[in-house]
Amino acid sequence: MKALFLGGVAAGTAAGIRGRLPARLEVEILDEPIDRVRLPQAAADAETLVSNHWRADYPPAPNVQLVQSVATGIELIELTALPAGVAACNAVGHESAIAEYAVMVMLAWWHRLFEISAEFREQGSWRTSWVHDGTPHGEVRGSTLGIVGYGRVGREVARRAVPFDCRILAANRTPRAPEPGVGRVFPLIEIDHMLPQCDIVVLCTALGPETTGLIDARRLSLMRPDAFLINIARGQVIDEDAIYSALHDRTIAGAALDVWWQYPNAAEPERRGSRHPFHELSNVIVTPHNSGWTDGMVQRRWNEIADNINRFVRGESLINVVARY
């Protein structure tokens, strides 16, 4: 049997788990940039494909039965370009790290951490302190937190927010009972009723037809003017033009954006995440889609991927199956 690890993240995964794979499994690694000379034969021979992308213009892969993503999303894998019956599995283990990020930026924003630290470092200013009876900053306690997408990540965000004495609401595409500390889980179609109540909105939902452009200009206008928006879902969940206008014009107070509308490629390895200059806005925390990229997450994900490949080789039931084509 043969497994093809395709792309930079997959190559790193292969290095991390190779010693845990069956000796009879042949492993081929094609790192970035993809070697188009080696790819046709590698694709033709592989029963397992480990990658976060596969395109229709790639060579045929007639024997592939398992597509193991190295990420949570499989939207860059064109399953229609693979054999019928293929199982597509994702990799998780990122929930706790991403939830920590959400709580971190929520606290940093409410406590004006970056602004106050920079001012004190650069100017030695005490104007935000009790020493000069300065203007106090906020706190998370007593605020209303709205979580859009009450799945693995959303539930972890809620669990971490409970000790801060927030009022917690959520919205989800499918019915789900609230865990302790969560006041209500709205159907996603009722999100318009939730947004005006929230001081903080965290987007954790998967990207799909129902959620593409979910947060548009109209829904941004429903949010409170002092609201803070955190996107740890996918860039396309928010209308790019609408959120830039809302932040530029301060119709909402601020945002933390970890996911984007465009990503680096071979031609532009340091490509900005948007056609708009979000990085120039002082009310936006920007990070390069790394909220879940922790050492602990990498190890957890490697364990899951190795386990799934071993299950496949042994003919056992797979884990984290998200699609069958």
Model-assigned labels for residue ranges:
Residues 99-118, 162-166, 303-316:
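Oxidoreductase and adenylate-handling cofactor-binding alpha/beta cores
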Residues 54, 71-72, 199, 205-207, ...:
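Short glycine-/small-residue-rich Rossmann-like dinucleotide-binding loops
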Residues 44-122, 137-138:
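Phosphate/diphosphate ligand-binding glycine-rich loop within oxidoreductases
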Residues 133-225:
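Rossmann-like dinucleotide/phosphate-binding beta-alpha-beta segment
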Residues 39-42, 57-60, 193-197, 219, ...:
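Structural alpha-helical scaffold elements that stabilize or flank donor/cofactor-binding regions
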Residues 55-62, 79, 210-229:
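Rossmann-fold NAD(P) dinucleotide-binding segment
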Residues 226, 232-325:
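Rossmann-like dinucleotide-binding domain for NAD(H)/NADP(H)
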Residues 1-48:
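N-terminal glycine-/charge-rich "phosphate-binding" loop or analogous flexible N-terminal tail
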